[in-house]
């Protein structure tokens, strides 16, 4: 099964080797037919501590690194 790849924005980089990435997605509500924007936060591993708040990054699924980290930052802009 392929690993999932998501794009988002770093909203916190205070922890050591960890960034919090906010991923937004849009979908059409099945009843009201309105586009709804939903966001979710992921804790991702950043081994070099090189990403700061506001950076756009891509994260990929990986083995569990800690209790909450199962994503790794692969590249950013």
Curated annotation (Swiss-Prot):
Family: Belongs to the universal ribosomal protein uS17 family.
Keyword RNA-binding: yes
Signal sequence extent: none
GO biological process: translation
Protein name, as recorded: Small ribosomal subunit protein uS17
SUPFAM superfamilies membership: Nucleic acid-binding proteins
Keyword terms, alphabetized: Ribonucleoprotein, Ribosomal protein, RNA-binding, rRNA-binding
PROSITE patterns: RIBOSOMAL_S17
Annotated Gene Ontology cellular component terms: cytosolic small ribosomal subunit
InterPro entries: NA-bd_OB-fold (IPR012340), Ribosomal_uS17 (IPR000266), Ribosomal_uS17_bact/chlr (IPR019984), Ribosomal_uS17_CS (IPR019979)
Entry keyword annotation includes DNA-binding: no
Subunit structure: Part of the 30S ribosomal subunit.
A single GO molecular function term of this UniProt record: structural constituent of ribosome
Gene name per UniProt: rpsQ
Function: One of the primary rRNA binding proteins, it binds specifically to the 5'-end of 16S ribosomal RNA.
């Amino acid at each position: 099964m392929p690993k999932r790849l998501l794009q988002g924005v770093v909203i916190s980089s205070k922890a050591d080797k960890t960034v919090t990435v906010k991923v937004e997605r849009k979908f059409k509500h099945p009843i009201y037919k309105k586009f709804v924007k939903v966001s979710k936060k992921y804790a991702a591993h950043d081994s070099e501590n090189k990403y700061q708040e506001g950076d756009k990054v891509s994260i990929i699924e990986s083995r569990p690194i800690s209790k909450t980290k199962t994503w790794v930052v692969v590249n950013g802009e």
